[in-house]
Each structure stands twice: as structure tokens, then as C-alpha cells.
């Protein structure tokens, strides 16, 4: 699987459509990271460009804060698992995701 975290600095970005950076991590069938995580700086905030990047990269799971219903429906229609309303640092969220294999909506890392 390939997960994409929508970031703002070290934290999950509060809004999908305002993100300017993402982190892509590959996970094998045993739940272990494979390869090096890849951080991509986006040229500017754009939900449409972010959706295009997600599809181009073959992402299977998206972890984000808030996301507009239209973008959520589009990504799920394309077969992606979208875990939204997540709050925490990228590091905490990845650790929690790897331990559990998923995140419940509205998960808050403290």
C-alpha cells in the first residue's frame, strides 16, 4: 500500500485544499515501511492538483485533516481509503497507523 499524508510543517494539515506539502510512504503486506519516505512540496494550495498527484502516484490511502465532501467522494469513488479529521504530527500519525493498520475518523494524537 502507498499512503499519503497531507502536511503543514510537521503536522497533518488542517485542510486538504490548503496543503502545500505531502509525505508518501510505502508499506509492505506485513505493515512495514519499504524504501525511504518521500516528501513533496507543492507549488501552491490546490485540491484539484493534489487529487491529480494522488492518482498519478498510485496512492491507496490518504490521511488528512478536514476535506471538502466533493473531494472526499471523488477519492473514495476512485477506490482510495480516505482517513479524515485526523489531528497530530505526521510522525505520530504514521506510528499509530502502522500499529493499527487504519485510523478512525477524528483521531487525535496527544
Residue ranges and their predicted role:
Residues 60:
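Short acidic/polar active-site loop segments enriched in Thr and Asp
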Residues 1-49, 53-57, 77, 83-110:
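Non-catalytic interface/targeting segments
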Residues 63-64:
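Conserved SAM-binding loop
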Residues 67-72:
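Short, glycine/polar-rich helix-capping loops at beta-to-alpha or helix-loop-helix junctions
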Amino acid at each position: 500500500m502507498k499512503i499519503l499524508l497531507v502536511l503543514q510543517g510537521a503536522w497533518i494539515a488542517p485542510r486538504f485544499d490548503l496543503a502545500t506539502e505531502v509525505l508518501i510512504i510505502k508499506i509492505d503486506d506485513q505493515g512495514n515501511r519499504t524504501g525511504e519516505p518521500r516528501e513533496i512540496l507543492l507549488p501552491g494550495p490546490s485540491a484539484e492538483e493534489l487529487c491529480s498527484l494522488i492518482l498519478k502516484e498510485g496512492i491507496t490511502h490518504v490521511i488528512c485533516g478536514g476535506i471538502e465532501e466533493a473531494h472526499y467522494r471523488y477519492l473514495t469513488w476512485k477506490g482510495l481509503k480516505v482517513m479524515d479529521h485526523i489531528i497530530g504530527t505526521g510522525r505520530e500519525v504514521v506510528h499509530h497507523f502502522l500499529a493499527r493498520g487504519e485510523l478512525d475518523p477524528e483521531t487525535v494524537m496527544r
